[in-house]
Amino acid sequence: MQYQSEVIEFLDEIHKAGVRYLLIGRRSIIAYGGPVQTMDYDIYVDNNPENLDLLFKIAKKYDLVPNKSKEEIRKHFMFKLENDFSIDVFCPKFFSAGKGKKLSFVELYDRRSIAKGEKGFEINLPAIDDLIALKKLGSRPKDLEDIQYLEGLKQIKGE
């Protein structure tokens, strides 16, 4: 699929340019070896203006256009970059995890794992425990399946 390679090229470029991001959602489960499928790409990005400007600059090279204005993005903290493919972009400073707990981008980014692929490709992933916490926010059946996989992976790794 052509769009798949374009998405990979885009992710590679934002990584190499130093955009502060994490691949989240089911694509991150796949990156951890999970036997799941998805067509979606979701990223969580640092919402400081310089970081978002760098993301938008690179997106423009791929003719990816935000589906919301910058003002709307600042209010809602979620948007899509769209063209022949789309990427869901989340950019709140933190997600509320209930009981006063917060999952902040800065903390998740500081604990990130970097997955390495072919030809020098690298991608930022949340640490397994952080990905479990993010998946618990969804609590859909597929999120629960993903959590089971990640818990099993932790056991295998001895964590």
Please give the residue ranges for each predicted region:
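Compositionally biased terminal segments of proteins
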Residues: 1-159
